């Protein structure tokens, strides 16, 4: 069960960092192909 907890913590941390960067820097350029 420890692996599941660590995976959840890792995903949540990455999600928080991603949202923080995404919302701090609003996309000015209209996304043509964001991949």
Curated annotation (Swiss-Prot):
Compartment annotation: Plastid, Chloroplast thylakoid membrane
Keywords: Chloroplast, Membrane, Photosynthesis, Photosystem II, Plastid, Thylakoid, Transmembrane, Transmembrane helix
Pfam families recorded: PsbT (PF01405)
InterPro entries attached to this UniProt entry: PSII_PsbT, PSII_PsbT_sf
Biological-process GO terms, alphabetical: photosynthesis
Disulfide bridge partners, by residue number: none
One annotated Gene Ontology cellular component of this protein: chloroplast thylakoid membrane
Record-annotated membrane-spanning stretches: 3-23
Membrane topology: Single-pass membrane protein
Keyword Lipoprotein: no
Keyword Oxidoreductase in annotation: no
Subunit structure: PSII is composed of 1 copy each of membrane proteins PsbA, PsbB, PsbC, PsbD, PsbE, PsbF, PsbH, PsbI, PsbJ, PsbK, PsbL, PsbM, PsbT, PsbY, PsbZ, Psb30/Ycf12, at least 3 peripheral proteins of the oxygen-evolving complex and a large number of cofactors. It forms dimeric complexes.
Assigned protein family: Belongs to the PsbT family.
Cited function: Found at the monomer-monomer interface of the photosystem II (PS II) dimer, plays a role in assembly and dimerization of PSII. PSII is a light-driven water plastoquinone oxidoreductase, using light energy to abstract electrons from H(2)O, generating a proton gradient subsequently used for ATP formation.
The protein, known as: Photosystem II reaction center protein T
Organism the protein comes from: Nymphaea alba
Gene assigned in the entry: psbT
